[in-house]
């Protein structure tokens, strides 16, 4: 099969993005472009793993399925954008599509160079989306902060890659593990630190509150969900190269085992720090977007703990499974936030006056995000804890469970504001179209969060 056929989704998305530059770019056109790319991805499915472009990309059934999931979530995002009728710029859809292109390329990348370029492609789009609300000082401030910090961490990543290349003489992902020296270890640390920044994992998380609060809510919805899923898959791809390494001229030696454990330890430590910082940083937050940002740090921590203790490159990996559940839940929660004109947590009491169904669904989503049984968020956390116990990380398993209990208190506080505080007299200002589309998304996400555990049984 022609190698360019395997790149059909990326080629299709790039061409459609360029076409939108010359059209009156609207969110409806963006949704159509994603649907066409989704069809192209179905058409380019493969039953075997294939390396293309001289080994820069690896196309496999799993990577193609991940692309389908990312594209499906992007469709939901564009429906949200259509519902609120806010794009702020005629190039809004183009920026989203180009950022999406970077995500699709990143999950297929098999060299450090291609991975770096793909990650930067989807990051640049996010920098602009953060400040796309031109008349907002907060949005401009968020965009500048995000761009400056992101550029700095980009330099850290490329410096780490250069150190790895100096020692190993190779840019494939397996080059992370075929050498063993202090310079090589520093290179790995710098490279992984850049990826940790992209997913807002501790200790590279301080930016997230200001960016989530300052960016337009539509933009926040985009980079709060999709980049995390794609980058978690990237991290799992790095780990999967350790088990066992099939590399020409190399054997699975003591040095390789030391490097693999070193990478796992970085992710594991970051996971613990993320849960700790995320759990306690979310306390006392009064802005709902800021709260979601800090709470997401803890969720990333659970993902990293799952990734660091499993090399399974599949949806059965605890880190990827957690990321999927997190994405579903957050899409529903942020759909509710899109309905709110005032992003203060106390404004959530308006939900019950305006739409009792949305208020109920929102509370169910909060329970799922908190990890309350029997919601699917509980099972994703339990899966991570089970993996920790099986790998003899008992203290960390206990710590993660205690952190989950603590986080349930502030989720309960928001549920109280939504359902048990005196109702406001005014309703949420939204057209019928807003309510119809966003309510549908919220209810569907809530149903999945409530009854999704049935899928685990079967």
Swiss-Prot record:
> What is the annotated localization of this protein?
Cell inner membrane
What are the GO cellular component annotations?
plasma membrane
**Would you kindly state one Gene Ontology biological process term found in this protein's UniProt entry?**
ATP synthesis coupled electron transport
Which Pfam families does the annotation name?
Proton_antipo_M
Q: In the record, which residues are listed under signal peptide?
A: none
Single Gene Ontology MF annotation:
quinone binding
EC code: 7.1.1.-
Q: Which residues cross the membrane?
A: 3-23, 29-49, 64-84, 92-112, 147-167, 188-208, 222-242, 265-285, 291-311, 320-340, 358-378, 394-414, 437-457
Main subcellular location = membrane
What the entry lists under InterPro entries is as follows: NADH-Q_OxRdtase_suN/2, ND/Mrp_TM
Q: Topology versus the membrane, per the UniProt entry?
A: Multi-pass membrane protein
Which reactions is this enzyme annotated as catalysing?
a quinone + NADH + 5 H(+)(in) = a quinol + NAD(+) + 4 H(+)(out)
Instruction: State the UniProt keywords alphabetically.
Output: Cell inner membrane, Cell membrane, Membrane, NAD, Quinone, Translocase, Transmembrane, Transmembrane helix, Transport, Ubiquinone
Q: What is the similarity comment for this entry?
A: Belongs to the complex I subunit 2 family.
Q: How does it assemble?
A: NDH-1 is composed of 14 different subunits. Subunits NuoA, H, J, K, L, M, N constitute the membrane sector of the complex.
**What is this protein for, i.e. what is its function?**
NDH-1 shuttles electrons from NADH, via FMN and iron-sulfur (Fe-S) centers, to quinones in the respiratory chain. The immediate electron acceptor for the enzyme in this species is believed to be ubiquinone. Couples the redox reaction to proton translocation (for every two electrons transferred, four hydrogen ions are translocated across the cytoplasmic membrane), and thus conserves the redox energy in a proton gradient.
Q: What is this protein called?
A: NADH-quinone oxidoreductase subunit N
- This chain's source organism reads Neorickettsia risticii (strain Illinois)
Q: What is the lineage of its organism?
A: Bacteria, Pseudomonadati, Pseudomonadota, Alphaproteobacteria, Rickettsiales
Q: Which gene encodes it?
A: nuoN
């Amino acid at each position: 099969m022609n190698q360019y056929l395997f790149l059909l989704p990326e080629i299709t998305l790039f061409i459609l993005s360029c076409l939108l530059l010359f059209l009156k770019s609207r969110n409806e056109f963006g949704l159509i472009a994603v649907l066409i790319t989704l069809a192209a991805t179905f058409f380019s499915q493969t039953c075997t793993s294939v390396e293309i472009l001289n080994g820069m990309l690896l196309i496999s059934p799993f990577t193609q399925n991940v692309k389908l999931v990312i594209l499906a979530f992007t469709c939901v995002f564009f429906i949200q954008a259509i519902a609120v009728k806010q794009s702020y710029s005629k190039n809004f859809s183009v920026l989203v599509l180009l950022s999406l292109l970077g995500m699709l390329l990143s999950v297929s990348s098999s060299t450090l160079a291609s991975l770096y370029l793909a990650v930067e492609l989807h990051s640049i789009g996010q920098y602009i989306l953060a400040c796309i609300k031109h008349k907002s000082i907060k949005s401009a401030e968020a965009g500048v902060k995000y761009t400056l910090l992101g550029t700095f961490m980009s330099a850290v990543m490329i410096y780490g890659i250069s150190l790895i290349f100096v020692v190993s003489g190779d840019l494939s992902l397996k080059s992370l593990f075929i050498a063993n020296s202090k310079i090589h270890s520093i290179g790995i640390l710098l490279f992984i630190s850049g990826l940790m920044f992209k997913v807002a994992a501790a200790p590279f998380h301080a930016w997230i509150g200001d960016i989530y609060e300052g960016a337009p809510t539509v933009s926040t919805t985009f980079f709060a969900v999709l980049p995390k899923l794609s980058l978690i898959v990237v991290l799992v791809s790095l780990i999967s190269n350790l088990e066992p390494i099939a590399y020409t001229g190399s054997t699975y030696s003591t040095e390789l085992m030391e490097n693999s454990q070193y990478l796992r330890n970085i992710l594991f430590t970051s996971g613990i720090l993320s849960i700790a910082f995320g759990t306690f940083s979310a306390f006392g937050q009064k802005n709902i977007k800021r709260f979601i940002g800090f709470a997401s740090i803890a969720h990333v921590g659970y993902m990293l703990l799952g990734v660091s203790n499993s090399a399974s490159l599949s949806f059965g990996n605890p880190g990827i499974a957690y990321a999927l559940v997190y994405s579903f839940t957050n899409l529903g929660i942020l759909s509710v936030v899109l309905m709110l004109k005032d992003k203060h947590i106390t404004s959530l009491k308006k939900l019950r006056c305006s739409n009792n169904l949305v208020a109920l669904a929102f509370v169910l989503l909060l329970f799922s995000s908190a990890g309350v049984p029997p919601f699917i968020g509980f099972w994703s956390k339990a899966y991570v804890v089970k993996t920790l116990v099986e790998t003899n990380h008992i203290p960390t398993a206990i710590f993660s469970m205690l952190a989950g209990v603590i986080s349930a208190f502030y989720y309960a506080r928001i549920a109280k504001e939504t359902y048990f505080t005196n109702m406001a007299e005014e309703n949420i200002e939204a057209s019928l179209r807003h309510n119809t589309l966003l309510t549908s998304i919220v209810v569907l996400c809530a149903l999945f969060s409530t009854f999704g555990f049935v899928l685990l049984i079967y």
